[in-house]
C-alpha cells in the first residue's frame, strides 16, 4: 500500500487519531480556504504510480511558498500528488515514535508494537540515511495469536511505563480494529502503521520520515488534552499490565 493510500485508509477508519490530511492532486485544485485551519503546513508528495521513496516534502508558514513548492514538484514529475498536513507546533515534538505491525496472513496472526525514543543524536542520524523506523527499539511488545497480554520482547530500563501504559492500550486497540477490518473484507494483509506519542500521552497515526519532522524551532509548551469518548472508553475497557 502506498504511503498516501495508507493515510487515506487511516483517515477513513481512525479520523480522530490520524494526522490531519488534505489530499490535492495539483496546486490549481487547492482551495486556499481549506488551509485556514492552521498557520503551519507540512506537505509531502507521492507518485500516483511507481516508487514513493525519497520524495519531496517541506514545511511552510506562507501560502505562496507552499503553492510554489507544489507547482515546482508537479512540473518535475507529472505523476506527483500531495498530502498537506495542517498542523500546530506540537506536531513536531513527539518524544516517542513507533510501528504498529498487524499480521493477518498465514497461520500466525498477531500484533506487534515497536517503540523508539526520540533523541537529538538519532534525529541527526536521519541525514545519514537512518530513518526513525531504523532506530533501535526501546520497547517491543508481541501480541502473538492476538493475545490480550503481550510478550515483552524488549524493554529499556529507563522507560516510564506508567506514562506509556495508556498510549499502548490505544495503539493495541487500533491494531485489533485494523485486523478486524481486513478480516471482514476477506483480505490477508501484513501492514505496518507508524505512530507518534506526545508529551501528554496523545497518540497520532503518522510517519515521521525526515529530520524536518522534529524541527527544534517548533518546540512548544503542551496544552491540556481533550479526552474524547474514544479515549475514555479505552481507559475504562482496558487495563493492560506491562
Question: Which residue stretches match the model-derived regions?
Answer:
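Nucleotide/phosphate-binding sheet-loop regions of phosphoryl- and nucleotidyl-transfer enzymes
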Residues: 1-242
Amino acid at each position: 500500500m502506498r504511503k498516501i493510500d495508507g493515510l487515506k485508509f487511516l483517515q477513513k477508519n481512525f479520523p480522530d487519531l490520524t494526522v490531519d490530511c488534505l489530499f490535492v492532486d495539483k496546486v490549481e485544485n487547492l482551495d486556499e480556504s481549506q488551509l485556514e485551519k492552521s498557520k503551519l503546513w507540512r506537505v509531502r508528495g507521492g507518485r500516483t504510480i511507481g516508487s514513493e521513496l525519497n520524495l519531496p516534502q517541506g514545511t511552510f508558514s506562507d501560502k505562496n511558498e507552499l503553492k510554489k513548492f507544489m507547482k515546482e514538484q508537479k512540473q518535475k514529475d507529472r505523476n506527483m500528488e500531495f498530502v498537506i498536513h495542517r498542523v500546530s507546533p506540537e506536531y513536531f515534538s513527539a518524544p516517542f515514535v513507533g510501528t504498529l505491525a498487524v499480521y493477518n496472513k498465514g497461520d500466525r496472526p498477531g500484533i506487534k508494537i515497536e517503540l523508539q525514543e526520540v533523541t537529538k543524536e538519532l534525529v541527526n542520524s536521519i541525514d545519514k540515511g537512518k530513518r526513525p523506523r531504523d532506530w533501535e527499539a526501546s520497547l517491543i511488545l508481541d501480541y502473538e495469536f492476538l493475545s490480550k497480554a503481550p510478550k515483552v520482547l524488549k524493554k529499556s530500563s529507563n522507560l516510564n511505563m506508567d506514562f506509556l501504559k495508556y498510549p499502548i492500550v490505544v495503539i493495541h486497540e487500533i491494531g485489533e480494529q485494523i485486523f478486524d477490518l481486513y478480516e471482514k473484507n476477506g483480505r490477508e494483509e501484513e501492514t505496518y502503521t507508524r505512530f507518534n506519542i506526545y508529551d501528554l500521552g496523545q497518540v497520532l497515526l503518522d510517519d515521521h520520515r525526515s529530520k524536518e519532522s522534529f524541527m527544534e524551532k517548533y518546540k512548544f509548551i503542551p496544552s491540556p488534552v481533550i479526552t474524547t469518548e474514544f479515549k475514555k472508553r479505552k481507559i475504562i475497557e482496558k487495563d493492560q499490565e506491562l
